[in-house]
Amino acid sequence: MRRSIAITGATGFVGGVLLKRLASTDWQIRALVRPASMHKRPSQVVSEWVAGDLEDMESLRRLVAGVDAVVHCAGAVRGAGLVNFERINVDGVARLVLAARAQHPKPRFFLISSLAAREPHLSHYAASKRKGEEALALNAGSMPWVILRPSAVYGPGDLELLPLFRWMCRGIAPVIGSAKSRFSLLYVEDLAEAIVCYLKSGMGLGRSYEMHDGHAGGYSWGDIIDAVARVNGRTVYQIKIPVPLVMLGATFNLAAARMCGRAPMLTPGKVRELTHPNWVGDNTALTRDTGWIPQVTLDEGLRQTLRQDRAACRK
C-alpha cells in the first residue's frame, strides 16, 4: 500500500520543488491550494488537491485525513505588522497541527520553519516563526514532529533573492551591514532532498534542525559577489549603502504599505535581519540523524538559478 503525504504551500517556491522531488518516490501526494491559486497547480504530480487555506479548519481536516505524513511549507514572508505574520505562521500552524493530531494513527508532522526563528527579537517575521515552532510543540501531543530551520533558500523560481542576483549580474551589488557579517545559504533542491531523507529515516523526532549548503562558516557578501562574478563572467562592483539610510527608507515603505493595504518586504525588521552579524547554520545534527549531505555548491546553485532566469543576465 502506497504511503500518503499532505503538503501545504505546494504552489509556492519550496513546496513546488518538493512536489517534483516526491513525484519520483512512492508517496501519494495530497496538497492544499487556495482557490485563488488553483491555476498554479502542476499537472500529473498531485493525486488530490484540497481547496482551502490555513484559516479553514474543514479543509485542513480533509487535507490530513488518513495520511502518513504532513509537510507544512506554507508561510507568510511579508506583512505590515505582527498580526499579519501570526495569522499564518502561528495560528495556521496551530490549526494544522490540531487537525493532524486528531487522526488515527497520527501522522508524522514536518514544519519547515526558518533560521530566523533563532533570533525572534529581530523582526515580526522572526518572532512569528519562533511562535509557530512553539505552537507545534504545544499542540502536537503524542504526534511525532520535526522542525527544519533552513538558512536563506535560493534557486530557480525564488522571487525574494533573485532581484539581488539580477543587480549583481548587471555588475552592481548593493550591500548593507558589516563586511564581517556571515550567513549560510541553501539551494532549494537540497532542502527538498533533506525532507525526503527525513521521511525515510524517522530519526530525531521532537526536535529542530538547522540546515545549510555545507559551506563551513557561511559566506560574506564578498564571497557572494565573487561567486556571481565567476558564474556570470563579469566584474561585480560593491556599493555600500548606509544602514541608517536603508532603515529610513524601510520605515517610509512600511508606512506607505499600511496606508495602501499592501504587505511590504522591506521593513525595519527586515533591515535588522539583513544586518544581523551571524546567520551561519549547523548541519551536524541533521546529517547525523538522516545521512543527508547537501550536494549543490554555491557556484552551481547560482549557475542553475541564473540559467533559469536568463533575463537576469541580459538586462
Predicted regions and their residues:
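Short-chain dehydrogenase/reductase
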Residues: E86-V90, L122-E133, Y154, D158, ...
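Conserved Rossmann-fold NAD(P)-dependent oxidoreductase catalytic core, especially the SDR/UDP-sugar
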Residues: H72, D91-R130, V146
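NAD(P)H-binding glycine-rich loop region in Rossmannoid oxidoreductase-like domains
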Residues: S37-M38, S43, S47-D91, R101, ...
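Substrate-positioning beta->alpha
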Residues: L159-P163, G177-K200, G206-E210, S220-D223
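Mid/C-terminal beta-alpha module of Rossmann-like enzyme folds, strongest
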Residues: S201-M265, V296-L306, A312-K315
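Alpha-helical membrane-targeting segments
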Residues: P163-V188, T235-N278
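Conserved beta-loop-beta element that borders a ligand/cofactor-binding pocket
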Residues: E134-P156
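N-terminal Rossmann NAD(P)H-binding glycine-rich loop of SDR-like oxidoreductase domains
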Residues: I5-T25
